[in-house]
Design a protein with these regions (language model features):
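Intrinsically disordered, low-complexity proline/glycine-rich segments
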Residues: 11-183
Length: 183
């Protein structure tokens, strides 16, 4: 699986900005910053253990507003992810590229009713066409996670473009620090 396939599909026939070379790794570790009083912050590490990205989610926003930077000093913003809706049930998250003047590069839309039982998200290109899917690994496990053993059964999601697998998100079992492996 190679995450760059998704990045290339989103940018469809456009030249990839040089700054996106950080997206060329096969695996990442996403670790939530603990003891953050307001909002959420995540460090995203490359396979060598270096910070590849830093993400910050603003606190007290009615509409989601997530920023992805090259590092913790937040000097270069790579992506912005925002939603127009207040409720998260079937929200569409718009992904924009600030390096290219805020151009809209694609979206992620949660399938609201389906996600009650098993989380499902759709990848959309800039034109709003469905190009891929992220889906929780199993409906049976998803139900157990939601109603009984959520803390014992880490979530796992598989992402595809068409029928081609491009990514896998797996939450690592750790009751103290949230860690997700992205392959």
């Amino acid at each position: 699986l190679h995450w760059s396939i998704f990045v290339e599909a989103v940018y469809m026939n456009s030249e990839l900005p040089p700054v996106l070379s950080q997206f060329q790794h096969n695996t990442y570790l996403i670790r939530q910053k603990i003891f953050k009083l307001f909002g959420a912050a995540f460090h995203i590490y490359d396979p060598a253990g270096n910070v590849a990205f830093y993400s910050k989610q603003k606190a007290f926003k009615l509409k989601e507003d997530i920023r992805i930077y090259t590092n913790e000093d937040m000097s270069m913003e790579l992506l912005t992810i925002r939603t127009e809706s207040i409720l998260d049930f079937g929200a569409t998250y718009h992904v924009n590229d600030p390096q290219q003047g805020g151009v809209h590069i694609g979206s992620l839309r949660r399938k609201g009713l389906k996600s009650i039982i098993r989380d499902e998200w759709v990848f959309l290109n800039a034109a709003g066409q469905e190009i891929g899917l992220i889906q929780e690994d199993s409906a049976a496990l998803a139900l157990l996670r939601r109603f009984y053993l959520g803390w014992l059964l880490p979530q796992q999601y598989d992402g595809t473009l068409g029928n081609v697998p491009v990514c896998n998100f797996k939450r690592n079992f750790n009751p103290f620090v949230s860690k997700v492996t992205l392959d």
